[in-house]
């Protein structure tokens, strides 16, 4: 063996040696990143048990910084290691091949690939990147689903469904006891039985026959104030009903608050407007494989994103984008997205896609006065915030490539006119230097055009709730026009226009001063001083000026939003550290 190593060293070139060191440095950085990420995650249960909800938010913000911080650290180390070879494409291609062999069969090989891509991109400033230097599109870089048996435990129903449910709950290890375990188990058993009866007849029949089994994931899913137990009820023929059990830690002890059943209900929990979960696992890709079984309509990038691996989610999304575009009819073209054209963003989409692409315009329409840098800061603010189910998550891409032939002539003309500085056309490719990707929704101002009175009342109720949920999370949307809100397939209202978003506590909410005389009232100029952060809630009514029915429906539930006192009270609560309860499931699903 020593002779073999000696021979290899003697036969190595400088390029071989440097490429090997580059690969080792990136791999060491990846391992350090993953360890730090996991260490923060490991504290989730303790924070839940101690009801340290402010620390929960701090830990989430800290974890969001880990990846970029480690990429920066590795990039600096690599510059020292490589120096003369830093800009040599051949050295990097060799380093990629060596790195690929190093992480081959590694438990987290796909995420390790993404970390290499990120490091290379940080050093090469993205624009010089070629796919030969990246782990992206080739089939060998796409891992196939792997067994997840080591992640789950199964409980037989042979002793009865109620007994199995009690075993399921008592198998969970917490420092805090349940305040009323027997009542929780009885309610959970009855709710799951009824859910199976409605959603999966085969599972329901086997529950009654004490046949089949319950399967659950060993690792809990922590987010905000709750812990979620994920699993499914399975019949022997393979029919199954996924579930997610929400556990809260109340002053009296632990309490089962709700259970979500079926893939559709679980999708609400894993929605794109929610904060990321903390899941105690060193096998995230296998957890994504398992979650894909429970929610087969969810894409892999959505699930990686949900458990906090947001950079790898971008890699998975890019693959998804390329595949779906390639497999769609050639007649499907990128076009301007439905809705009112943005003053700050050019937004486009393609038929069959669930996403929109948003590019910051070169010049903003009046009265917008922000800069590109300020808009980017707003989007970063949202990334760090607790989105409380009311802010759409975004993926930020640099130098994202598209097939030029898939763009409509009309959209191409708009792009050249409004985002020319962000646009590169090279051969058959259209490349965007900077772009945000968001989930596509129906703009609220368009949604209400097709509503009957019942649907209008419901969506206006949720519109106000969305604004109040954001206020409770110390977030003020800024521009609250209906065109800046979207409606999900569940009829839930979320906000997606971030160029004026800010912390609620940065605002100065005021009532409009009374005029002193008729001249002031008739004057076209303001008769009182206004500071840049002054907000006048009484003027929010103008948002409904074109739709009296919508205003009446909104006002019947949320007239308090037009008063400065409401907002001032919210600010006081935020400053006092109050964190409102926001549930990622319907109130009707909560246990009584």
From Swiss-Prot:
What's the domain of life for this entry?
Bacteria
**GO BP term (any one):** tricarboxylic acid cycle
Q: Name one GO cellular component term.
A: cytoplasm
Query: Can you state which reaction this protein catalyses?
Result: L-seryl-[isocitrate dehydrogenase] + ATP = O-phospho-L-seryl-[isocitrate dehydrogenase] + ADP + H(+)
Q: What is the protein named?
A: Isocitrate dehydrogenase kinase/phosphatase 1
- One Pfam short name: AceK_regulatory
State its location(s). Answer: Cytoplasm
Q: Which residues bind ATP?
A: 337-343, 358
Signal peptide positions are: none
The active site of this protein is located at 393
Please state which protein family the record places this protein in: Belongs to the AceK family.
- Check the record and name the InterPro entries matching this protein: AceK_kinase (IPR046855), AceK_regulatory (IPR046854), Isocitrate_DH_AceK (IPR010452)
Q: Tell me which PANTHER family the record gives.
A: ISOCITRATE DEHYDROGENASE KINASE_PHOSPHATASE, PTHR39559
Described function: Bifunctional enzyme which can phosphorylate or dephosphorylate isocitrate dehydrogenase (IDH) on a specific serine residue. This is a regulatory mechanism which enables bacteria to bypass the Krebs cycle via the glyoxylate shunt in response to the source of carbon. When bacteria are grown on glucose, IDH is fully active and unphosphorylated, but when grown on acetate or ethanol, the activity of IDH declines drastically concomitant with its phosphorylation.
Q: Quote the EC number.
A: 2.7.11.5, 3.1.3.-
Sorted keywords for this record are: ATP-binding, Cytoplasm, Glyoxylate bypass, Hydrolase, Kinase, Nucleotide-binding, Protein phosphatase, Serine/threonine-protein kinase, Transferase, Tricarboxylic acid cycle
